[in-house]
């Protein structure tokens, strides 16, 4: 069982804009493996996004995540 982070982020979407001044933001939630967290964090920030919430998640509810 691998440790996962459940992240909620906000990234500006340039593909959905109708005019130059309008900027549409896209919210998304995804599970990211513990090992890939830093890479994912860099990707979101380079795209001009903000990480709103980070939670530790496991595959099953009630499973010990191994934090002590």
Curated annotation (Swiss-Prot):
UniProt topology in membrane: Peripheral membrane protein
Main location (coarse class): membrane
GO cellular component: phycobilisome; plasma membrane-derived thylakoid membrane
Protein name as it appears in the record: Phycobilisome 7.8 kDa linker polypeptide, allophycocyanin-associated, core
Matching InterPro entries: Allophyco_linker, Allophyco_linker_chain, CpcD-like_dom
Keywords, sorted A to Z: Antenna complex, Membrane, Photosynthesis, Phycobilisome, Thylakoid
GO BP terms in the entry: photosynthesis
Subcellular location, record wording: Cellular thylakoid membrane
Role summary: Rod linker protein, associated with allophycocyanin. Linker polypeptides determine the state of aggregation and the location of the disk-shaped phycobiliprotein units within the phycobilisome and modulate their spectroscopic properties in order to mediate a directed and optimal energy transfer.
Ranges for domain CpcD-like: 2-57
Origin species: Nostoc sp. (strain PCC 7120 / SAG 25.82 / UTEX 2576)
Lineage top rank: taxon: Bacteria
Entry's family note: Belongs to the phycobilisome linker protein family.
Gene name for this UniProt entry: apcC
